[in-house]
Amino acid sequence: MSATIRIAVDAMSGDLGPRVAIDAAQNFLQCHSDLEITLVGDESQLQQAHSLTGKNSRLHYLHAPDVVTMADDPLSALRHKKNSSMWKSLELLCLDRADACVSAGNTGALLAMARHQIKTLPGIERPAICKSMPVRSGVTYLLDLGANIDVGPELLHQFALMGAALARAAGVANPRVSLLNIGTEEYKGTQVLQQAQVLLQSDNSFTYSGFVEANRIFNGDVDVIVCDGFHGNVALKASEGVAQFIADKIAVEFKRHVFSRVMAFLAWPTLRRLKLQLNPARYNGASFLGLQKPVIKSHGNANEQAFIHALEVALQQVQERVPQRILEQISLH
C-alpha cells in the first residue's frame, strides 16, 4: 500500500445525486493531508461540480457513463453495467489504483460486483455486511446485515472471527462475541445456532458471551453480535424505525401546548446532546468484511455529513489493515 491512501468513490449511485459525494470528498480532503480521492461518474456532471467547488490536486475524476440504479437486479447489473460508476470504482481497487471504495448504491449490485472483482480473502467463504451500532458505551458491531440469508454454523463462526478482527482494529483487546437468538438459555434456538455455539465456545481467540436477545443489542454487553443476514437486516431496520418513531413522538409531544414547549426549551441542551449522540450520520458506512480490500456501503439517502463518515470508515479500515487482520485471524483456524 502506498504512503498516500487512495479512496475510490462511486459518485453517482446515491439517492441524492453526485453533489453529496463531491462536497463530502472536498471537505474530507481538507481534514486529511495524506489522502487522495477519485470520484467516479458522469464526466459532465463531475466537471460542472468541479468548477463550482474549486481545484484540489488530491481530488481526481474518472468518467463512467452508466449508473447502477436501486431498481437494477444485481446479476443483471453485474453482467451489463461494466461502464457504470460502481463497477469502475471497484475496478480501481482491482487495478491497485485505490485502497478502498465507497458507494451509496444498490447493496446487492455492489456486493455482486465486489465479489467478482475484488474477491474474498483466502479461507473466507462469503463476505458479510457489518455495521457499528450505538450502545450505552461505545459501539457494538452487528453482522451479517443482509449478504447471506441462509447460513450454516461454520459460516457464523467465520462471521464471529471477522467481527472480532474488526473490533480489535477499533481498539478492543479481547472482543466479547455473542450469537443473536430468541433467548439466552443454551438450549434455545435453531440447530444451526446450537452447532454454531459449540464452535464459538471452543474458540479461544475471543471471549464467547453466549446468546443475546434483540432487546439487548444496545446494552453494550458485548462487542460483536453475529447472526444470519435475514435476522440481522430485520434487527437493523426495526431499530432504525423505532428510533425515528421515538424522535417523531418527542417532537409532536413538545409542540402539543405551551407548557410542553416551555419544557422543550428547558430540556433542549440535553435533547441536543442526545440527538448528536444518536445521529444516524455518525454511524453511516457498512463494511463488506471478508474482501481483499475495504468496500464501504453508505446509506442511499446519506447527506454530506453521513457520507463523510462513510469515508472515515474506509480510511480507518485501510489505516488499521482490517482485511489483513481478518486474514491473520482466519489463518489461525
From Swiss-Prot:
GO biological process per UniProt: fatty acid biosynthetic process; phospholipid biosynthetic process
Keywords of the record: Cytoplasm, Lipid biosynthesis, Lipid metabolism, Phospholipid biosynthesis, Phospholipid metabolism, Transferase
Molecular functions (GO terms): phosphate:acyl-[acyl carrier protein] acyltransferase activity
This enzyme's EC code(s): 2.3.1.274
Domain of life: Bacteria
InterPro entries: FA_synthesis, Phospholipid_synth_PlsX-like
Subcellular location: Cytoplasm
Gene Ontology cellular-component terms listed: cytoplasm
The keyword NADP is assigned to this record: no
Record field: catalytic activity: a fatty acyl-[ACP] + phosphate = an acyl phosphate + holo-[ACP]
Enzyme class: transferase
Cross-referenced Pfam families: FA_synthesis
Pathway: Lipid metabolism; phospholipid metabolism
Family affiliation: Belongs to the PlsX family.
Function: Catalyzes the reversible formation of acyl-phosphate (acyl-PO(4)) from acyl-[acyl-carrier-protein] (acyl-ACP). This enzyme utilizes acyl-ACP as fatty acyl donor, but not acyl-CoA.
HAMAP family: PlsX
Subunit structure: Homodimer. Probably interacts with PlsY.
Protein name: Phosphate acyltransferase
Gene: plsX
